[in-house]
Amino acid sequence: MDTQIIAAEKPLMAQARPRKPAPFLPMSRAEMDALGWDACDIVLVTGDAYVDHPSFGMAIIGRLLEAQGFRVGIIAQPDWHSAEPLRALGKPKVFFGVTGGNMDSMVNRYTADRRLRHDDAYTAGGEGGKRPDRCTIVYAQRCREAFKDVPVVLGGIEASLRRIAHYDYWSDKVRRSVLADAKADLLLYGNAERAVVEVANRLAAGEAPRELDDIRGVALFRRVPEDYSELHADDLDSADEGATRQKGATVIRLPALEQVEQDKEAYARASRVLHRESNPGNARPLVQRHGDRDLWLNPPPIPLTSDEMDAVYDLPYARAPHPSYGDAKIPAWDMIKFSVTIMRGCFGGCTFCSITEHEGRIIQNRSEGSILREIEKIRDKTPGFTGVISDIGGPTANMYRMACKDPKVEGACRRPSCVFPEICPNLNTSHDDLIRLYRKVRETKGIKKVMVASGVRYDLAVESPEYIKELVTHHVGGYLKIAPEHTERGPLDKMMKPGIGAYNQFKRMFDAAAEQAGKKYYLIPYFIAAHPGTTDEDMMNLALWLKKNRYRADQVQTFLPSPMATATAMYHTGVNPLRGVRHGGSDKVEAIKGLRQRRLHKAFLRYHDPDNWPVLREALKAMGRADLIGSRPDQLVPAHQPPGTGKAAGTRRPVRPGGKTQRFTTKGLRVMK
């Protein structure tokens, strides 16, 4: 049974009006005719190809609304050059729902060096260019052009992480809320099942979008009600961190758009307050001035109970791409079709990651029964299944059923992480439920192997030697990807990641368990280059650690400042929002912005690549560490240069939109067209 910090007013499926499910949600008039529909109640417009599977947001929302009795159509990756493709299913009777897809469209389209990507894992054939940049804005505007009087509701991760004024890496400026640019009526942030059901039912009952200002997880433009008292974000940066709270209805006023555009400390303060007001148990509404209007954000949605999670994942998905794609491969589908999501949310709080800002810090778990039913569906219905579950987990592999021991403490907590700088004593870190689940899945008829491919929080895993033994003995296939991200305390503190000692402890336990099981397994560590707070010396020390431990890392990535992440605020402002932000007294952070330095940091991670040796030799000399140039084991790069090498890709300039396309790399791996 779930112990909720705060209960929803009504269960998610309380108003369900089951209708016969469509084989696939229709994407054409012909499919609507076959279903006997004269119109759609709701049309969902998405930047992804339509795959009817719970790993794809439009499928979850579409099937959930179908279960509420609505006729739901899908328009996937429409031609955005005119409004006509948005009229393909006719005028929706209730609303247009618009999502950029499973990824922010700019993250999906450009690398960390702002180079154009050639492919798109969420498109048939893996072809890039099937969605516009900032596609949530473009689609919403085309929906409004197609049918001016139909409400437009934004959702998905792109809208969710751009819900307030935010720094945009690709334009290198602060942009206003996506709700303003899209000219939509409402924005639903986070996992929006509760909100979208209530919005749909109330709009269908005749309410206007502006009247839906009491729904959690909703952002809209509205005036501050007279019965609310305002608490300015500046007041939360007092020595007691705003511990003295005003009684009654209170809204926190963030620094205005015009202020955060000009004042970087004001931007950092807004980021800090937003993240501290993310607990559904104690978060208050936020308001931010945009010109002559107030953008209002209601508190975050109430997490789903296990029964509600089961209801969502048990909906009648076809578990396949829409037939209109024929035999075309959709890479994202091929990657996940034999995997199972068992939970949502993450309490790690890594500053470079936006999972917490979208899914929340509270873990939402499926029951064992629901998970086992899905595995049986994969076994029985998914073509090509050979008995191997490719991955079982969620945003992390091993937070299943972990929670605060005391709901009252959880409801009052404003910590950005439950595991940094140390694991909170109020956190239940037992892996027993997860171990039991693994065993039941392995016992399922027809299942030969269950893999845990990535996402293990090693700082949690070392709390359970039994879990590591279970993992290594049964759920690793040759190697396990793991993410220490760095070795040096400076950048790790800015990332809110544990020290390298925790990784070393996990590696010792992993290796011992592998030896005991008679296996030859390996860890593949991930590292980030150019994260805020990282110095050239930090990267040099990381490279020395890699060489000492005989790692030649291909799995590296350059920090990408994604919308709303705390590390993005550090990158943009040079201020650390993890600490109190006060004019003239804020904790400063070094941000690595120059292309030359960013690529130097990545070159340190690939110290073994001869193409990187010239730039590394030059940097080591400038740092006064020419002693690390030579062929001894304790030296980093040799003095000689093999013929035909030394032309590092780091000298190439990024491609801007409209420029010549080129090959690109992701996490250090060459990706072909």
UniProtKB/Swiss-Prot annotation:
Gene3D superfamilies: tm_1862 like domain (3.80.30.20). Residues 332-611 form the Radical SAM core domain. Its cofactor is [4Fe-4S] cluster. Binds 1 [4Fe-4S] cluster. The cluster is coordinated with 3 cysteines and an exchangeable S-adenosyl-L-methionine. Keywords: 4Fe-4S, Iron, Iron-sulfur, Metal-binding, S-adenosyl-L-methionine. GO terms for molecular function: 4 iron, 4 sulfur cluster binding; catalytic activity; iron ion binding. InterPro entries: Elp3/MiaA/NifB-like_rSAM (IPR006638), Methylthiotransferase_CS (IPR020612), rSAM (IPR007197), rSAM_horseshoe (IPR023404), UPF0313 (IPR022946), UPF0313_C (IPR024560), UPF0313_N (IPR013704). Residues 632-673 are annotated as: Disordered. [4Fe-4S] cluster binds at C346, C350, C353. Belongs to the UPF0313 family. This is UPF0313 protein blr7973. It comes from Bradyrhizobium diazoefficiens (strain JCM 10833 / BCRC 13528 / IAM 13628 / NBRC 14792 / USDA 110).
